[in-house]
Amino acid sequence: MLNQTKVSVLMAVYNTDFSYVKRAIDSVLIQDFQDFELIIIDDGSTVTNRESLLQYAEKYENKIIYIRHSNRGQAESINRGILNSVGEFITIIDGDDEYKSNHLSSCLREIKEEELICSTTETIVDTNDDFFVPDKNDLTKLIHLDETILFGTLFGRKKVFSSFSFKSGFAADADFYERAKTQFRVKKVDLRTYIYHRNIPNSICSTIKKENLINS
């Protein structure tokens, strides 16, 4: 990858059904903005998943970088991806979610003079679970899942991601956003170009507890 790559897309994967991972990868590859690298961090998947990921990475070697390490969790995997990225901007996609084809170009248009943006999502709930969760800061208030802060809703300049590492544990994404707000120009935007599939088995994000989702 050349140093002038515009966007680094990071994806941490751990034993998610490869059909979902393939959907996520394909949604990145078909972006209408093509100056990106996709860094897949394999967080210790099974042999079957590892082989599938390697085959895909080899097929698209001009776009995909594959990194593997023993199971460390999503936060540490994303941190490693940040260290290996060369893009001017960084964003994240979960292995069972997907982008609309204009996601990267929309984020680039929106960020303008900001240093980090957090976008709304288009949430697809795969069970009969509710679309609403309690606000961590006000438990009497319900917020829509589309409004919550997730790894994949963050898009920003590399210096923001290099300044703060993600902390392991629940709500690492929201915690990162709150810390970034103290030092950088941050804005929430209404894009809905990130498709969040909720309640997919074995997703790294599937264990996020509702009480840790917050609205900022």
Specify the residue positions occupied by each region the protein language model found.
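N-proximal low-complexity "stem/linker" segments adjacent to membrane-targeting elements
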Residues: 1-27
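Short, acidic, metal-binding catalytic loop of nucleotide-sugar glycosyltransferases
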Residues: 25-35
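A conserved acidic beta->alpha catalytic loop
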Residues: 42-51, 94
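Acidic donor-binding/catalytic loop of UDP-sugar-dependent glycosyltransferases
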Residues: 48, 97-109
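Glycine-rich, basic loop-to-helix element that forms the pyrophosphate-binding segment
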Residues: 69-85
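Short aromatic/hydrophobic "clamp" motif used to bind/position activated sugar donors
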Residues: 90
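Conserved donor NDP-sugar-binding/catalytic core segment of glycosyltransferases
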Residues: 104-131
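Conserved nucleotide-sugar donor-binding catalytic segment
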Residues: 138-216
